[in-house]
């Protein structure tokens, strides 16, 4: 399945433990893809471990790159975030330049997906690490979405609330502005009801932390998203 058609994504953190039994339930849940990525302590060993374990199942697997040292072949897609609301050029284009300089000769460009991130939780680790300006109005956020689609021509715009449940009005407003760029939503989903609500607006709903806190609740989000038109 092409990433443009994904509705539901389970995000696994390579720095967190997950049992084989729980991983099997995640991989056979009906989710569209397993997205591997994290902020802290992302290592090549962790990325390889999840790749090998998930490859036993039919579900596609993608890697969201946060550090050059943890890049490995074998994933179906490689998601490359550029943090549009960061004040640090490192997270907008410098790391990307370094990665292309090192791996450009062997990159399969059709496997790379550039995503414009807008981080909206001021207290999350990724906001602190990237120096993101999170005190944004809806107009600010919509402007970033327009910039992602019309200026940078990015295929994905990612609203990242990272640990807190976001504002559906913001997600709806952004979706109404995007015509070609796909809207990913991630952050704070702990129930099927929340997943269903965000699926009304976002093209793709990403479910992460709840996997490690309440697996049953996480699994229930798949049907909730898939049944939302």
UniProtKB/Swiss-Prot annotation:
Q: In which pathway does it act?
A: Membrane lipid metabolism; glycerophospholipid metabolism
Look up and give the organism this protein is from. Answer: Lysinibacillus sphaericus (strain C3-41)
Q: Which Pfam families match?
A: PcrB (PF01884)
Q: Look up the record and give one Gene Ontology term from the biological process aspect.
A: glycerophospholipid biosynthetic process
Catalytic reaction(s) noted:
sn-glycerol 1-phosphate + all-trans-heptaprenyl diphosphate = 3-heptaprenyl-sn-glycero-1-phosphate + diphosphate
Q: What class of enzyme is it?
A: transferase
> Where are the membrane-spanning stretches?
none
Q: Which GO terms describe its molecular function?
A: heptaprenylglyceryl phosphate synthase activity; magnesium ion binding
Q: What is this protein called?
A: Heptaprenylglyceryl phosphate synthase
The cofactors it requires, by name, are:
Mg(2+)
